[in-house]
């Protein structure tokens, strides 16, 4: 649920904001250049006028309010699992990934917590109706499991397909040709996914869903980073509506969670219930975007 508020800046700046706001002596020196000194009051005033200060404060209040309201329901094991999944996905590049996205390890884990807390709040406030579930059922597809070989050129992908046509093993070709270092050593197998999964290009998902068990793509699939060859491992039948209530409900929640209008209203309600208020007149508008239809008054 990646649309939820990004808290990467939190670690970089929020400590200073909190520290300065709670100081008993605003004239305490924080820095010096030449014979000039910068007091805490001067620094706080400058920080207060920065556009990012409102974003930082909003992130702090939202995270804090959600944690206060739903922290006891947070699955910490799932947060840790998600964090480790990112670490595994990026491998030796994980630290670079964090730096490029303005995260520390702590703030990145907070972002994951924030996503889970927001989803908990969403489920508390909204429930899919039977008609919504039936509408979701029309386009529902079960999760599938595939192997893939990721290449940077169409020619390489065509070479792979030709070798598959000649009876060579998909797993051995994945090991030899796939540029996906995370899956090339395990036959190119990917975790089960569905059409709602945003990790994969739509062309990849559409190409995969056309396959029956043990079939592979006869033409390279064009994706953002090159060309894919896909083999179907498990393509379950759709089943029946009565047995798929849980999956349909989760699919609807995932769609709602990616809708900024819906999530702003959800967060607005949490802020209202937690009696969030901003005392500083210069930062008063930090939560304006969440006042919306719930008419919250911060």
UniProtKB/Swiss-Prot annotation:
One GO CC annotation: plasma membrane
Classification via Gene3D superfamilies: 3.10.50.40
Protein localization: Cell membrane
Keyword presence, Membrane: yes
Entry EC number(s): 5.2.1.8
Lineage, opening ranks: Bacteria, Bacillati, Bacillota, Bacilli, Lactobacillales
Single GO BP term: protein folding
Protein name: Foldase protein PrsA 2
Membrane topology according to the record: Lipid-anchor
The gene coding this protein: prsA2
Residue numbers with lipid attached (S-diacylglycerol cysteine): 23
Coiled coil feature spans: none
SUPFAM superfamilies: FKBP-like (SSF54534), Triger factor/SurA peptide-binding domain-like (SSF109998)
Keywords: Cell membrane, Isomerase, Lipoprotein, Membrane, Palmitate, Rotamase, Signal
GO molecular function, one term: peptidyl-prolyl cis-trans isomerase activity
Record domain PpiC: where: 141-234
């Amino acid at each position: 649920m990646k649309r939820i508020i990004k808290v990467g800046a939190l670690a970089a700046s929020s400590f200073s904001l909190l520290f300065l706001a709670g100081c008993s002596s605003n004239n305490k020196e924080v820095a010096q250049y030449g014979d000039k000194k910068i007091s805490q009051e001067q620094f706080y005033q400058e920080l207060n006028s920065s556009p990012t200060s409102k974003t930082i404060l909003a992130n702090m209040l939202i995270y804090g309010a959600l944690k206060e309201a739903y922290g006891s329901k947070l699955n910490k094991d799932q947060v840790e699992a998600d964090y480790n999944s990112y670490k595994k996905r990026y491998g030796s590049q994980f630290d670079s990934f964090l730096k490029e996205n303005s995260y520390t390890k702590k703030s990145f884990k907070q972002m994951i917590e924030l996503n889970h807390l927001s989803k908990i709040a969403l489920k508390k406030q909204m429930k899919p109706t039977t008609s919504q579930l039936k509408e979701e059922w029309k386009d529902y597809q079960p999760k599938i499991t595939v192997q893939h070989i990721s290449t940077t050129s169409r020619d390489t992908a065509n070479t792979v397909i030709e070798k598959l046509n000649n009876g060579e093993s998909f797993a051995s070709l994945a090991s030899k040709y796939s540029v996906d270092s995370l899956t090339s050593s395990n036959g190119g197998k990917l975790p089960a996914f569905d059409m709602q999964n945003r990790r994969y290009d739509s062309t990849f998902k559409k190409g995969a869903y056309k396959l029956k068990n043990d079939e592979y793509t006869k033409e390279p699939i064009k994706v953002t980073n090159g060309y894919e060859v896909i083999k179907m491992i498990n393509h379950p039948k759709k089943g029946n509506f009565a047995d798929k209530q849980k999956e349909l409900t989760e699919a609807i929640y995932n769609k709602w969670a990616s809708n900024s209008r819906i999530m702003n209203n959800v967060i607005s309600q949490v802020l209202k219930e937690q009696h969030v208020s901003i005392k500083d007149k210069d930062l008063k508008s930090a939560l304006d975007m969440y006042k919306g239809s719930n008419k919250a008054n911060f």
